[in-house]
Amino acid sequence: MHQGGPHNVSIAALAVQLKEVNTPEFKKYSEQVVSNSKTLANALMAKGEKLICSGTINHLVMWDLRQHGVTGSKIEKILDVMHITTNKNSVVGDKSAVNPGGIRLGTPALTTRGMTEEHMEIIADFLVRSVKMAKDIQEKSGKKLVDFVAGLNESEEVKAMGEEVTAFAKQFSIPGV
């Protein structure tokens, strides 16, 4: 039986992390994460998208999709097929967390791969295009998530955009891989 108390591996991991975050390189990285997030938020808003808090001051962007009549669950699914990882997220005014009206977008992984502000503009375009595709699929397949997913898996347009996203992402290495 293992009881609580200090664990040497946890203490060592914390020491390494504290040393890393105290470097000029980490400060520069952190500033780039926030700059990328702000650029992504501004690019989405410039395309007419609504964000929670009208922007961001940190590494996250909360995108309110309710104006489009599609749920965060559906956008999460379509983006996943396109090789873009997001999280569905409830937004203020949602009636149920099962069908959230938003998507949470983060920039740390993108920044770690070497993406900068110019790349956030391209990503914003991918995101906005995905909503149009989702609306078209929902119109053809119906509002139920299971029907949407079936329609999504049959969409050649979605597959083509997934290939476009993959080609874009291949420009950037994945650290440690």
Residue positions per predicted region:
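Active-site C-terminal subdomain of aminotransferase-like
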Residues: 1-71, 153
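Alpha-helical context
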Residues: 2-5, 9, 13-16, 20, ...
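Short, well-ordered loop/turn and helix-capping segments at boundaries between secondary-structure elements
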Residues: 16, 20-23, 67, 81-85, ...
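Generic, well-ordered alpha-helical scaffold segments in large soluble proteins
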Residues: 17-20, 32, 36-39, 43, ...
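An acidic, carboxylate-rich microenvironment
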Residues: 28, 74, 119-122
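PLP-dependent enzyme catalytic core of the Aspartate aminotransferase-like
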Residues: 36, 97-177
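Conserved PLP-binding catalytic core of the aspartate aminotransferase-like
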Residues: 50-117
